């Protein structure tokens, strides 16, 4: 697979909660088509990094770009509903009465989805329907 375009870029991102520094100088590049894992011990800032990228929280400093557009910086903040990002951290966040497609589509219900695109992505990820 050719990784030809940068989808997400985070540079020098920092986040603190009170006096507790959770992220310091966090950097990340995610290329189109790449499968990425973020590993670390409990409390190392993995969830915080993802929440910052999704827009659920604002970083204290640094820049986050999505498809070469600045979505979070000192001057810019694009709210989560405009970022076209969805996350499911653990299986307890899934609706047990919905299948894979319906669980994913639930978070996208406010956005226009091209016919067949969701099925295409599910197939690309080798998920069972």
Spans of model-derived segments:
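Helix-to-loop junction immediately C-terminal to a conserved catalytic motif
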Residues: 54
């Amino acid at each position: 697979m050719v990784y030809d375009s940068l989808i997400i870029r985070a540079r020098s991102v920092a986040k603190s909660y009170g006096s507790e520094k959770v992220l310091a100088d966090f950097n990340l590049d995610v290329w189109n088509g790449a499968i990425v894992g973020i590993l670390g011990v409990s409390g190392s800032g993995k969830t915080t990094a993802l929440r910052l990228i999704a827009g659920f929280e604002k970083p204290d400093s640094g820049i986050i770009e999505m498809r070469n557009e600045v979505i979070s910086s000192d001057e810019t903040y694009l709210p989560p509903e405009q970022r076209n990002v969805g996350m499911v951290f653990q299986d307890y966040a899934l609706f047990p009465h919905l299948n894979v497609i319906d669980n994913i589509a639930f978070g996208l219900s406010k956005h226009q989805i091209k016919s067949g695109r969701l099925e295409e992505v599910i197939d690309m990820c080798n998920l069972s329907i």
